[in-house]
Amino acid sequence: MRTLWIVAVLLLGVEGSLVQFEMMIIKVAKRSGLFWYGAYGCYCGWGGQGRPQDATDRCCFVHDCCYGKATDCNPKTVSYTYSVKNGEIICEDDDPCKKQVCECDRVAAVCFRDNIPSYNNNYKRFPAENCRGDPEPC
């Protein structure tokens, strides 16, 4: 519980994509990104190493790669505009950076939704020392 409180306090000072990403996951996957994916596998949460453990962890790996390709902007803080129509996310910005970051978040949120059956509680708070092997290229 203390960890969730610390995360909540930290998020109060965060604007832009991370908060929007959380809301997008809630709208699409119907679950909290912070709770379910904040510390999952080898790639969900801060950093990443080794090989993704399952399809859910791979969603985070792909998201990390996508953020790494964002050019001329900080994907974790940029704010973007999106809407949800008929359960589908539509990224609405014309700005290339905002559009790219929104698309990264959209793809990950849909990936989480589509891979809920692969979620394995054994990978929640998975120790980094268990994340072995050469990382795959993005």
From Swiss-Prot:
Broadest EC class assigned to this enzyme: hydrolase
> Where are the catalytic residues?
63, 105
UniProt keyword terms in alphabetical order: Calcium, Disulfide bond, Hemostasis impairing toxin, Hydrolase, Lipid degradation, Lipid metabolism, Metal-binding, Platelet aggregation inhibiting toxin, Secreted, Signal, Toxin
In this chain, Ca(2+) is annotated as bound at 43, 45, 47, 64
Q: Answer yes or no on keyword Calcium.
A: yes
Q: Where is the signal peptide?
A: 1-16
PANTHER family the UniProt entry points to: PHOSPHOLIPASE A2 FAMILY MEMBER, PHOSPHOLIPASE A2, MEMBRANE ASSOCIATED
Would you tell me the protein name for this molecule? Acidic phospholipase A2 Cvv-E6g
Q: Per the UniProt entry, what species is this protein from, by scientific name?
A: Crotalus viridis viridis (Prairie rattlesnake)
